[in-house]
């Protein structure tokens, strides 16, 4: 079966025979027609992302928001894959003592994101960068058998637990076709296509997921690719857009629409879905920034009653809280190069002002949480 998106090809013979999908290179042929509802959605998505970008440039402590957004995107993207983990798990200051594999996976995703963003400053968005990022993502004991940082040499498939090539929901390109597809995708990413970058990002994500070049981690790398592409194109200046928020909320539709492209060649319905994802995710990010800014300003006023010395220390700890909303005193003191006693006094002030709350009284180290801040970030996780 062949359509605009590609063709299903036969592999092996006899009882071992199976069909894999060979994707057609991008851009689609015939070309994407951007008109009607698609054009309306494109304008709306671009407008909301521009608003988000405007906020990013005006907020002095945007770096703190971005740090949290990277963690939230990592968590949401991992949850799409079935990871059982909470925001509190990955923000816990004693996280290195956590032996939960799901938590380790999300922490690796955060590291992979930070690595890729830094690497993008010196490398174009290419297969080398994608492989290097994948190696960081699977940097754990259970990731070693999945060939971290290497495209696969064997056939993979997508299906439920215990599924085989015979009953798989989808069989990506065989290894030879996969290498061709990834080479074509790399060329497309770095081409001068006249399509709007948001539409290009939707196509690139679809193509990467369809090609499934790795034995594991394809979904997470594929979603990270969206942010990296938009940053390279100058649409985003920071990774402030967590698109996995929308994809998680519409997970079944997300997978179903990709399947529809492969079966019918209908890229337009996929692009329509993705533009809605961009618009809704940008709107949610804007709303979150507004709420966090309001909370920041409200709590900052509480420090006006402090002495100059107390205020200086309190502001340092407060700024730290906005990128680490769950703390213990010792780690905070070390990170800020302050004495234990000074941080302890500030924590006491923040508890009195109802900014901090002691949330773990069972362990040796007392854990304190910035509850209002966490409640805003916790939405949809």
Identify the residue ranges that each predicted region occupies.
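FIC/Doc superfamily catalytic core
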Residues: 1-381
């Amino acid at each position: 079966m062949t359509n605009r998106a590609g063709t299903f090809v036969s592999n092996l013979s006899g009882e071992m025979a199976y069909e894999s999908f060979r994707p057609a290179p991008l851009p689609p042929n015939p070309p994407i027609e951007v008109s009607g509802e698609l054009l309306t959605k494109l304008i709306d998505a671009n407008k909301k992302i521009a608003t988000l970008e405007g906020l990013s440039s005006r907020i002095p402590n945007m770096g703190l928001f971005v740090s949290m957004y990277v963690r939230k995107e990592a968590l949401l993207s991992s949850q799409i894959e079935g990871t059982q983990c909470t925001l509190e798990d990955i923000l816990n200051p004693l996280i290195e003592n956590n032996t939960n594999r799901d938590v380790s996976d999300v922490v690796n995703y955060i590291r992979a994101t930070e690595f890729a963003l830094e690497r993008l400053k010196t490398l174009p968005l290419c297969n080398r960068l994608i492989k290097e990022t994948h190696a960081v993502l699977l940097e754990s004991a259970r990731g070693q058998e999945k060939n971290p940082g290497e495209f696969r040499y064997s056939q993979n498939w997508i299906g439920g637990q215990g599924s085989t090539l015979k009953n798989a929901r989808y069989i990506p390109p065989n290894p030879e076709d996969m290498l061709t597809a990834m080479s074509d995708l790399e060329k497309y990413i770095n081409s001068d296509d006249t399509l709007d970058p948001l539409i290009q990002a939707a196509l690139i994500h679809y193509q990467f997921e369809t090609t499934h070049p790795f034995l594991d981690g394809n979904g997470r790398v594929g979603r990270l690719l969206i942010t990296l592409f938009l940053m390279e194109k100058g649409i985003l200046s920071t990774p402030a857009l967590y698109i996995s928020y929308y994809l998680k909320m519409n997970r079944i539709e997300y997978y179903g629409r990709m399947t529809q492209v492969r079966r019918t060649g209908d890229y337009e319905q996929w692009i329509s879905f993705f533009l809605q994802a961009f618009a809704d995710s940008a709107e949610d990010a804007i709303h979150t920034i507004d709420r966090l800014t309001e909370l920041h300003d409200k709590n900052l006023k509480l420090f006006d009653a402090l002495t100059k010395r107390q205020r200086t220390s309190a502001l340092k700890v407060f700024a730290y809280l906005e990128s680490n909303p769950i703390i213990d005193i010792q780690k905070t003191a070390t990170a800020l190069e302050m004495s234990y006693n000074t941080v302890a006094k500030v924590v006491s002030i923040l508890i009195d002002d109802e900014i901090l709350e002691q949330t773990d009284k069972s362990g040796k180290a007392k854990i304190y949480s910035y509850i209002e801040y966490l409640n805003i970030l916790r939405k949809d996780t």
